Design a protein with these regions (language model features):
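Hydrophobic alpha-helical membrane segments
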Residues: 56, 79-97, 117-124
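Small-residue-rich segments of transmembrane alpha-helices in multi-pass membrane proteins
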Residues: 47-50, 106-123
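Juxtamembrane boundary at the C-terminal end of a transmembrane helix
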Residues: 125-136
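Membrane-helix boundary connector in multi-pass membrane proteins
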Residues: 92-112
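Juxtamembrane helix-break-helix junctions at the cytosolic face
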Residues: 63-81
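Core segments of alpha-helical transmembrane spans in multipass integral membrane proteins
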Residues: 19, 23-25, 46-68, 85-91
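Physicochemical signature of membrane-embedded alpha-helices that form the seven-helix bundle of GPCRs
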Residues: 9-16, 48-55, 78-85, 112
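Hydrophobic transmembrane helix segments
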Residues: 2, 16-48
Length: 136
């Protein structure tokens, strides 16, 4: 299994990113009211949060499936690039919000911004370190 993942570092970073994705899956699918109260979104935002969760949950399912595949991440470049692009978009939007370019009245959370940067870094490291495997 370690050989399929190109080393122990990749095998540590990948589950960390999946745990983070799992956390957001739980929040968006099973506990949207936590996000409603954290960001003062209002009760009418619950359906749209669950719609976001309907995109996050399949991503998590595919990510867990990749862990247990016989060939590991072999040929799964689109999954890794997708995760990188989603995280990058989150970071760009959070910077835009923090700089009052996008939605200047919204409530921001520094913790979410840090997590976004961590996810971008993990995704970039995994793409770089697994490039000969995921693009095979």
């Amino acid at each position: 299994m370690i050989e399929a993942w190109g080393g122990i570092l990749n095998l540590v970073l990948y589950p960390i990113s999946m745990l983070g994705l799992g956390y957001y899956t739980v929040l968006t699918v099973f506990s949207p009211n936590t996000l409603v109260s954290r960001y003062d979104l209002g009760e009418k935002s619950v359906p749209i949060i669950r719609i976001v969760g309907s995109f996050v949950l399949p991503t998590l399912i595919i990510g867990v499936w990749i862990i247990f595949r016989e060939n590991g991440p072999l040929g799964c470049w689109i999954f890794f690039v997708f995760n990188f692009l989603v995280s990058l978009c989150q970071v760009i939007l959070s910077w835009g919000t923090r700089l009052k370019i996008i939605d200047p009245d919204s409530k921001t959370d520094v913790g979410d911004e840090v997590v976004g940067h961590v996810f971008v870094a993990i995704a970039a490291i995994l793409i770089f370190r697994l490039s000969d495997t995921i693009y095979a």
